[in-house]
Amino acid sequence: MAAIYKGTLGLIGNPPLVEPVNLEKELGLEATILVKLEYLNPAGSVKDRVAKAMIKGAEEKGILKEGSVIIEPTSGNTGIGLASIAAAKGYRAILTMPETMSVERRNILKAYGAEIVLTEGTKGMKGAIAKAEELAKEIPNSFIPGQFVNPANSKAHRETTGPEIWKDTDGNVDIFIAGVGTGGTLTGVGEYLKSQKPDVKVVALEPAASPVLSEGKGGPHKIQGIGAGFVPDVLNTKIYDEIYKADNDEGFAAAKLLAKTEGILVGISSGAALSGAIAYAKKTENKGKTIVALLPDSGDRYYSTPLFTE
C-alpha cells in the first residue's frame, strides 16, 4: 500500500528521541540523556503542534473560516507554524514579533507569504502582544489564536508530545526538562507524564537573565523562544518541581557541543534545554536515571546570531 500524504498536516508530531551517546561519553555522564528532535516537524519546530491545534479548534468553533485573517504575536516559531498552515489553508497571516528576533525567522515567515510587523525589542513579547491586539481591532474578520492564553496549546502536548515520550521510553523517564516560553510544552507534557508516573521530576527552564518564575523579575536575554518576561496563563505553575536558570553562554556551548559530537544542529533554546539536561545528568543523585529534554528547533534559524557568529 502506498504511503503518500495529502499535504503536510498529517506529518506533524512523532519526531524521534535520540540518545547523544558521543556527548555523554565526552562529558563522562552517568545518567542517560534523551533529546526529542522537534525540528523534524514539517515547518521546523515544536510549535507546529500548537499551530495545528489552535487553527483546528478555531475552525471547529466557526471562529476561523474562509476570508479570516490570522494575527498572532510570536517570537518566531509559532508564527512560522501558523504561517505554514495558513498558506496551506488559504488564510491571510499577520505576525507581530520583537525586532530582536533573528533575520532567518523573519525570512521564513516571508517565504510562507505571511506579513510581519516588528515591534520594539525592549518591550519583548508584551510589545508584540499589544500590537497584535491593536491590529485585531482594526482588521475585520481577524482572529488571534493567542498561544499564551489558548488552552489548545497545552492540550496539544498533553495529547501528543507527552504520550509520544512515554511510549518511546517504555515509561522509563525520570526527569523531563523544557524551556518555558508560553509554558504549553512543559504544562502539557508534564501533566501527561505525571498522570502516568507521579514521581517524574518536571523541570522548568528559564533564562538566568530573566528569572520570572524563580525570582519574579524579567530582563533582556539572548535565548530566543523562551523567557517571555511574564508568567503566561497557559503555564501550570504547579506542574513543575524545580526551576533551572540557564545563562546565555552555557546554552550556546551545549548547542555547539551537540553539533560537534553528534552532528545535530539545534537552535538557541534547544541548547539551553540541553545545558539543563547536562547539569542534571552531572548530579550524583541522578546516576542511572533517564533525562528527557525537548529541543524545539534547529540551528538553521540562527546563523546570524551569536550562536554562530561568536
Q: What name fits each language-model region?
A:
Residues 1-310:
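PLP-dependent amino-acid enzyme catalytic core
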